[in-house]
C-alpha cells in the first residue's frame, strides 16, 4: 500500500491509447440538441466501447449504450423523448426506467454506472431529489438536474471470456494501472506477510482478524460474523 501511494509507473494507468474524456457535452438543460453517431471506438484501459457523436458540427465521446449503431440519432436536453439512448435530466425520466452514465453533480458529464454491462434504476422522485437504485441494492439521492442516459452500457459479458494466458492478463492489468501478478500470502516468507513462513501451503494460525486491527496485520478474514463450516453453508 505504501508503494502504491508513491505513484510509481507500475501503479499508474498508461495514457497511450487514450482518446478523450467520456462525458456529456456541456449543454444547457433548457436547450434541445440532436446528435448523430459517427463511429464506435475502443479506448485502451476502458471495458465499455465509446460512441463518437456529432452535436452542432462538434464531436464528443460518450459511453456506448446497448443496441446503438453508426448513423443512429440521439436526443439530448429539453423535450427529448424518454426512450433508449437519449440523454435527459433525471427529473424528466419516469420511475422504473433503466439508466446509465449518471451525473453525480449537475454538469459533471457523468460519473456513475459507466462500466460495461452496468445499469441503474430510477427508484423514486421526491422533494430532496431523485433516488437511484444501483445493482448492489444501494440507493442514492441526487440532484434532479443531473443527467443520465436511458439504457444499459454496452460490452456486457466481457468477463465471461477467459484470459487463457498470463501474458494477456498482464497486458490488461497494465492498461488499467493495476499491479500484476500478486503473490499469495501463504507463499511468502514470514517477514513479508502474516500468513507466510513454514514449509506448508496453509496459514497455520487463525486467519480471522478484528475490524480495528492495525494495517499490516489486517489480512485474512476481516471481522467475520461466522467462521468454519457454518459460514461455508451460508455462502452456498
Predicted features and spans:
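Beta-strand/loop nucleic-acid-binding surfaces
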Residues: 58-69
